[in-house]
Design a protein with these regions (language model features):
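Basic/polar, cationic surfaces and motifs that engage anionic cell-wall
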Residues: 3, 32-36, 50-51, 125-217
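Alpha-helical and His/Cys-centered functional microenvironments
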Residues: 12, 64, 176
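Active-site-adjacent loop/helix surface patches within enzyme catalytic domains
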Residues: 40-165
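Compositionally biased, intrinsically disordered low-complexity regions
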Residues: 18, 26-29, 44, 91, ...
Length: 217
């Protein structure tokens, strides 16, 4: 089921601005925004604002060391090592659209926001802590790993035609402030390689979105 929150985020992504408050309430403003987005995209059914049910992409890091383990492959649809290689997770995009944790369908990568959301993760940040300055641990994120994640996002964007925006391509740390879905103190990504302290997640998320657009689209 596509939720009101999904529609609100998609409308904002299509228009590239916060046209609707993402609050999960399907009121007159949301209905009007959906109608305007349908007109802009040339579709007759509101469900067709989503290509094959894909809502968007959430960017993560695994908090893992070098080398993929089964738990990580189960948790994400795609993984990327710090050298820039990309690996398939256990769940396909089609399975993610049909997400059902009770039946073991899809990856559970984001609390209360998995159906149709594709989880991409850099396999890194073992031992990292959100201290000031940052404790980077034994296996920090790299731009090579992030770029692999962004390139895969671009590939998915071309296939499933979702907007590149703060509402549809965002980090785990942006989910709560941007889409209002409560998370458990997630800080991926509030830092990028070379940072010494955490920053606002949306400010940080704008950097890979801009990098994605400039380098991979």
């Amino acid at each position: 089921m596509i939720t009101a929150r999904d529609y609100q985020g998609r409308v904002n992504g299509i228009f590239g601005q916060p046209k609707l408050i993402v609050d999960g309430m399907n009121g007159p403003n949301t209905s009007a925004g959906i109608s305007q987005a349908m007109a802009k995209m040339g579709v007759r059914r509101k469900e067709d604002l989503f290509n094959r049910g894909v809502r968007g992409v959430v960017w993560h890091w695994t908090a893992g060391a070098n080398g993929l383990i089964e738990l990580e492959k189960k948790a994400y649809n795609f993984l990327h090592d710090t050298k820039g290689n990309t690996y398939d997770g256990n769940a396909t995009v089609a399975e993610q659209v049909m997400y059902d944790w009770r039946r073991g369908i899809g990856a559970s990568h984001t609390k209360s926001m998995n159906t149709g959301w594709i989880g991409l993760s850099v396999d890194a940040m073992a031992g990292a802590k959100q201290t000031n300055p940052i404790t980077w641990g034994s296996h920090p994120i790299t731009w090579s790993g992030i770029d692999a994640m962004l390139e895969q996002t671009a590939n998915l964007h071309h296939e499933y035609v979702f907007p590149i925006s703060p509402w549809t391509t965002l980090s785990h740390a942006e989910v709560q402030p941007t889409l209002g879905v409560k998370q458990r103190w997630k800080w991926d990504y509030t830092v990028l390689p070379g940072d010494t302290k955490s920053r606002d997640p949306v400010e940080v998320g704008n950097i890979p979105r801009e990098r994605l657009t400039e380098r991979f689209l």
